[in-house]
């Protein structure tokens, strides 16, 4: 491996091989070490390395003691801790709270390589190992738990993760600019207690003095535990102030102290993103993992070209993590990475994805937000697109065109989420046409999620007629191009606001259109989303209105079964759901029916077969006549015999030609 392309050291032996007798920062991660820009830990570590710091990685340490944390010695400036690319509780448990059997971010997919809530566990072990070292926590797990939050797995409200993880600072969001500033100040020996004015960070204080930012007060931990309406109000404040331009510092009291969450850091500019992705990554799994790490398979030949999402889905945590303001890399930066992939071992000519949170976003949704920030209480796309929406795919189309022309690349696919509602707003159909023609590998996955308008409003999704319009145009483009490509809709059951009757309506639509989804996602209440707030409180934080919530496991199972009505093992639940909703008319033999009744069930009668008319008595056979043409059963044919001496005009003409020698 060429100089400058080594993995970062993961042991004291590797530090010695580099000639290091000290190092500056220890980066602890709950994932196995993959040196690829799709992993946040790697991005942060390589960024610090590019700033001249010596950085070591400690992936998935043994958390039962502090020995692994001491193994490389004490870092000069601090320890940075991340809980992994995926929330650890989602990685470990299904929505039914059953333990998963496979962890894609660990060697060989083996479970048990990290604890539940590793950010808390690791921080406590680091504090045990080195009581005076500065500790900074970050990543998705910490970011979504920066405020007091409802924890689905414990079924209770937990305080901010900063009160459980003995860290000095929390970095939320993507974190590059905040981490770089923290590192700069720690290297200058600034005490962590003075690092209170950095955007994109949170800290705990005994007294809230004068703040650098405008202040917004949220209901405290005790209040949100005791009153669900207070929890909903706190959630709205947290979302409203999550803006790098107009956002305030949010202060939340907790057990006699105060959590202060500064406004988000501004998104990286295009040139900063380009520089970040141009750093030297090996793009490989560390060789210490003999059985590999499955997570590399999805991203090894994929490219991230954007950040942020203004889609506004209430059940998605990305907006609360990356923010709603979209930024993207330059075309040249993305093409350079594509050319790099063509030289990678194992590359077979296929770019698996050119995407991000939403693949077809390349710029902010409107020019106004660059000056004023994102709008409060409004979504750019749902339920109706904003009049100021700037829907333009021209740059993305150019990017994909130029990538297709790179020598060594056979196909370029787009597999990240496509926002079809945004695509339909673009008057230029070039991107849609080229997407269908060049960038789909047999099927396109989109996320309408449901078909009932009230449910879609709670989800923050566009109404279903938008999906139907897209579906028709997609089919038309495939017909015109002579291609047979399928549309795979993602669907969700049991989202707050979705009743059993709503699930029946969705099942009817799927049945009518010949759709039998293989996979259905139950709503998963993860920290930091508006939908999770609705699930816990039964209140929509946007307007404080009451929301129906399916909490009973039996009802959730029935909603899921309705969307998979054709599976034999789901039949009993489907029957029970149809009985409960008074829709037993969907059990029967009519075309509209979801399932047929079984013998002895009091539903629908089989269609009555029409009685066959009695056959007329057979007539005795007549004796065969001496002459005349006869049909199959001896009856005369309709064509009469030709009269003797007569000749048809056609035969007359033929005879005349023969006679005249022609």
Region locations from a protein language model:
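Glycine-rich beta-alpha loop elements in corrinoid/cobalamin-binding modules
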Residues: 14, 32, 40, 59-255, ...
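Conserved SAM/AdoMet-binding glycine-rich loop
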Residues: 27, 43, 62-63, 340-488, ...
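Conserved, mostly hydrophobic/aromatic
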Residues: 168, 276, 313, 334, ...
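Terminal amphipathic helices with adjacent charged low-complexity linkers/tails
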Residues: 64, 193-242, 256, 265-268, ...
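Flexible glycine/acidic-rich beta-alpha junction loops that bind and position SAM and/or redox cofactors
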Residues: 87-96, 144-146, 176-181, 205-210, ...
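Intrinsically disordered, Lys/Arg-rich low-complexity segments
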Residues: 608-662
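N-terminal pre-triad scaffold of radical SAM enzymes
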Residues: 30-31, 289-317, 350
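Amphipathic alpha-helical packing elements
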Residues: 161-173, 561-605
């Amino acid at each position: 491996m060429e100089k400058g392309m080594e993995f970062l050291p993961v042991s004291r032996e590797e530090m010695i091989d580099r000639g290091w007798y000290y190092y500056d920062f220890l980066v602890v991660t709950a994932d196995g070490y993959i040196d690829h820009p799709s992993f946040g830990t790697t991005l942060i570590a390589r960024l610090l390395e590019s700033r001249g710091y010596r950085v070591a990685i400690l992936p998935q340490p043994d958390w039962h003691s502090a020995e692994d944390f001491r193994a490389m010695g004490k870092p000069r400036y601090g320890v940075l801790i991340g809980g992994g690319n995926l929330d650890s509780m989602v990685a470990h448990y299904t929505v039914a709270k059953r333990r998963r059997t496979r962890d894609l971010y660990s060697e060989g997919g083996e479970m048990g390589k990290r604890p539940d809530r590793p950010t808390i566990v690791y921080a406590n072990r680091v504090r045990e190992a080195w009581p005076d070292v500065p500790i900074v926590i970050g990543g998705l797990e910490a970011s979504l738990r920066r405020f007091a939050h409802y924890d689905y797995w414990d079924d209770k409200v937990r305080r901010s993760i900063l009160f459980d993880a003995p860290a000095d600072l929390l970095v939320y969001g993507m974190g590059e600019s905040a981490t770089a500033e923290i590192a700069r100040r720690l290297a200058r020996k600034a005490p962590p207690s003075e690092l209170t004015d950095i955007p994109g960070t949170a800290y705990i204080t005994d007294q809230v003095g004068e703040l650098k930012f405008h202040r917004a007060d949220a209901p405290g931990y005790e209040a949100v535990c005791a009153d669900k309406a207070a929890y909903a109000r706190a959630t709205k404040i947290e979302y409203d102030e999550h803006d790098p331009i107009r956002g305030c510092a949010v202060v939340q009291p907790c057990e006699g102290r105060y959590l202060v969450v500064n406004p988000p850091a501004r998104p990286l500019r295009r040139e900063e993103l380009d520089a970040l992705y141009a750093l030297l990554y090996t793009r490989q799994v560390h060789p210490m993992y003999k059985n590999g790490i499955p997570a590399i398979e999805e991203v090894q030949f994929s490219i991230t070209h954007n950040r942020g999402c203004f889609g506004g889905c209430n059940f998605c945590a990305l907006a609360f993590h990356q923010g709603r303001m979209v930024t993207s890399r330059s075309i040249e930066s993305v093409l350079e990475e594509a050319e790099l992939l063509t030289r990678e071992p194992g590359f077979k000519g296929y770019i698996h994805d050119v995407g991000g949170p939403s693949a077809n976003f390349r710029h902010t949704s409107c020019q106004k937000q660059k000056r004023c920030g994102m709008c409060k209480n409004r979504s750019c796309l749902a339920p109706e697109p904003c009049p100021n929406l700037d829907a333009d795919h021209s740059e993305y189309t150019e990017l994909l065109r130029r990538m297709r022309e790179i020598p060594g690349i056979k196909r370029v696919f787009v597999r990240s989420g496509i926002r079809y509602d945004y695509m339909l707003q673009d008057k230029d159909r070039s991107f849609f046409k080229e997407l269908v023609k060049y960038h789909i590998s047999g099927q396109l996955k989109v996320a309408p999620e449901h078909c009932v308008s009230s449910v879609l409003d709670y989800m923050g999704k566009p109404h279903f007629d938008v999906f139907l319009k897209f579906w028709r145009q997609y089919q038309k483009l495939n017909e015109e191009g002579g291609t047979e490509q399928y549309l795979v809709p993602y669907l969700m059951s049991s989202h707050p606001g979705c009743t059993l009757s709503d699930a029946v309506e969705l099942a009817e639509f799927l049945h009518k259109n010949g759709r039998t989804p293989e996979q259905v996602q139950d709503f998963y209440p993860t920290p930091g989303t508006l939908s999770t707030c609705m699930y816990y409180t039964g209140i929509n934080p946007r307007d404080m209105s009451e929301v129906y919530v399916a909490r009973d496991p039996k009802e959730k199972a029935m909603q899921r079964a309705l969307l998979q009505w054709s599976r034999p093992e789901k039949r009993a639940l489907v029957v029970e759901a149809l009985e409960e909703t008074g829709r037993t008319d969907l059990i029967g033999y009519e075309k509209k029916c979801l399932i047929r009744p079984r013998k002895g069930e009091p539903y629908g009668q089989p269609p009555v077969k029409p009685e066959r008319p009695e056959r007329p008595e057979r007539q005795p056979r007549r004796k065969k006549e001496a002459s005349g043409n006869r049909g199959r059963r001896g009856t005369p044919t309709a064509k009469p015999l030709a009269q003797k001496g007569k000749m048809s005009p056609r035969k007359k003409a033929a005879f005349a030609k023969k006679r005249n020698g022609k």
